[in-house]
């Protein structure tokens, strides 16, 4: 009997690899530089998990190539729960279209998808000199000036670029792309009137809307955003189904044991419902999602296909 019990003991222990997880500090890899919005959000998540799970969750910044360098490194790490990654649209759902065969990982196959935490809405803003107050007025105005108006983006292949091309397709206008190296120079030229419109992050655009330096035509998600609650959605304003946003979620290397996945998913679900956290997310112009592992995996598959179609339909070139 003792031999029988001893023979079964290892199997019982092996069946519960996440029973006491975590037993040491956990790294949360962030593919953004320190101080940016992605880094701020990552630290908010890490601090919450540290408080809730009894071990330190430490943010490690590894910026470069829209996060794909960091994502590739994480994909090759042990699936033991001690390395997590803050995934986003740029390194997951638009990465294959933008990087093609150069992408060194498969966003669907090479990761365990734990929780889709938030959507990052954009707001369509215009310089005050544009003679249009509403979205429909702007569309009518732009149709009288095909290829004569310009829109700024954060860079070629960025979500602000994709949103504007989706807008061109949905509205039938032809506004010309001017790519910048990041948000700051793009916003600076918009404020100076060198370009007419852009899809900016809600956090950035809200202060210029409230100061009257820019005007809003609407937000890019199907839900209104509390930080700019006076701005309608583009869907409400006459572009049915318009829904373009980046997103942020937590993933790990493929093969993460189910108990660890479940433990993290439960705590991250609590994160998206915590009243203090929700106030901070509202202040950052974010929309809570909270989809768990199965729904997150489905989202990545479907959103990748949707973005691939948009990129093809708009003939967007990344090189």
Each model region followed by its residue ranges:
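An extracytoplasmic/periplasmic, membrane-proximal ligand-sensing/linker region
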Residues: 23-25, 170-173, 210, 236, ...
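A ligand-binding cleft/hinge motif common to bilobed small-molecule-binding domains
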Residues: 91-100, 161, 166-170, 197-231
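Stable alpha-helical elements in mature extracytoplasmic
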Residues: 37, 41, 45, 49, ...
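Hinge/capping helix and adjacent helix->loop/strand transition within the periplasmic-binding protein
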Residues: 76-82, 97-185, 234, 245-280
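N-terminal (or domain-start) structured segment
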Residues: 14-109, 147-148, 156, 172-197, ...
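Structured segments of extracytoplasmic/periplasmic soluble domains
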Residues: 32, 48, 52, 77, ...
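N-terminal export signals
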Residues: 1-15
């Amino acid at each position: 009997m003792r031999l029988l019990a001893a023979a079964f003991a290892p199997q019982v222990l092996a069946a519960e690899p996440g029973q006491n997880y975590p037993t040491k500090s956990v790294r949360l890899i962030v593919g953004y530089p320190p101080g940016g919005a992605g880094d701020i959000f990552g630290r908010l998540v890490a601090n919450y998990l540290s408080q809730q799970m009894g071990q330190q969750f430490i943010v490690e910044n590894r910026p470069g190539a829209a996060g794909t360098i960091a994502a590739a490194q994480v994909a090759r790490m042990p699936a033991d729960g001690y390395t997590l990654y803050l995934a986003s649209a740029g390194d997951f759902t638009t990465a294959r279209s933008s990087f093609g065969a150069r992408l060194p990982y498969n966003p669907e196959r090479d990761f365990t998808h734990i929780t889709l935490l938030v959507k990052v809405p954009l707001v369509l803003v215009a310089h005050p000199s544009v003679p249009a107050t509403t979205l429909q007025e702007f569309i009518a105005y732009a149709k009288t000036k095909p290829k004569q108006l310009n829109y700024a983006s954060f860079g070629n292949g960025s979500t602000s670029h994709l949103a504007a091309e989706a807008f061109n397709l949905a509205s039938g206008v032809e506004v010309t792309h001017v790519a910048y190296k990041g948000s700051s120079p793009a916003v600076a030229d918009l404020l100076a009137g060198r370009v007419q419109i852009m899809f900016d992050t809600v956090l950035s655009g809200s202060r210029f809307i409230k100061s009257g330096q820019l005007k809003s035509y609407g937000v890019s998600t199907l839900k209104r955003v509390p930080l700019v609650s006076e701005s309608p959605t583009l869907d409400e304003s006459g572009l049915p189904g318009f829904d373009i946003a980046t997103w942020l979620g937590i993933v790990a290397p493929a093969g993460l044991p189910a108990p660890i996945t479940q433990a993290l998913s439960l705590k991250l679900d609590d994160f998206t419902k915590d009243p203090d956290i929700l106030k901070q997310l509202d202040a950052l112009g974010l929309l809570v999602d909270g989809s768990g592992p199965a729904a997150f995996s489905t989202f990545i598959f479907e959103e990748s296909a949707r973005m691939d179609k948009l990129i093809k339909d708009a003939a967007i070139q990344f090189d």
